Amino acid sequence: MRGCDQFCSYCIVPHTRGREKSRPIPAIVEEVKRLVDAGTREILLLGQNITAYGVAEARQDGTYTKDFSAFADLLAAVNDVPGLARIRFTSPHVHFMNDKFIQAVRDLPKVCKCFHVPLQSGSDRILKLMRRSYTAAEYLDCIRKIREGLPEVNFTTDVIVGFPTETEEDFNLTRQLMKDVVYDMAYIFRYSPRAGTKSARDYPDDVPEETKHLRNQILLEDLEAGAAERNARFKDTVQEILVEGVSKRNSERWTGRTTLNKVCNFLPVEGIRPGDLVNVRIKRTTANSLFGEIMVE
């Protein structure tokens, strides 16, 4: 899927990549089959607003309804490809995550229960300036619906601090919303104007850099505390790990990821290869990683 129809005030993507356009499901499935035949074990389905897959085309031919989710159909088709171990996707949009989509993620065994749902701000005033098309309450309602439909889920997000005219009150609303959700990880950016965007043209970059930096650090500290608590629940559990290879930080250890996209480090055993699925008993956790031992039958 290419392009974007959202036109957020700070983003250049719609101006450089054009409107949303989706590839046909058969073409995607054929590409996945070729990749799997070549040894690929995990597929990432990528789009600026991936849950809007097929929406533009459905609106053109008059088949779009509130229950429409061609992306759920795509997930089901890719899930049926033999030899594929896991399916990930990014990034969904608040307005295109309906019950059909949530049920597909829940029921399809190869689909990872990971949702990267960009927030950007917890302030309705700032969200409106950003042209994000949802309110903080609508965002939280979307998170609630997903959590109700899925017993175990990983949430990550994007946040911008220091957007033009952002006050301390606006920032604190963002901080509180992030605490309410409890994200597993977040990409937190300090605002900088992008040439050619509405925000660069119409809004003053009036938040001091030192204030942006401080707000960034506060959110990072909150995030680490929450992530450490979230990861602690995995201690003494057994997790299925898709092996990636030797750890970049410790050549004596190997690394892989859980279905919830948690990095897991472990000592290798004889015969292990990248792409294998192994069961690992988790012995220790941090805010960023899990550490365990492969269970040998």
Q: Which residues fall in each region the model found?
A:
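N-terminal pre-triad scaffold of radical SAM enzymes
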Residues: 1-9, 33-37, 41-44, 241
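Terminal RNA-binding accessory module
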Residues: 199-297
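Canonical Radical SAM [4Fe-4S] cluster-binding loop centered on the CxxxCxxC motif
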Residues: 1-26, 56-59, 200
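C-terminal, non-catalytic macromolecule-binding modules
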Residues: 169-219
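Residues at the N-termini of beta-strands
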Residues: 10, 42, 86, 114, ...
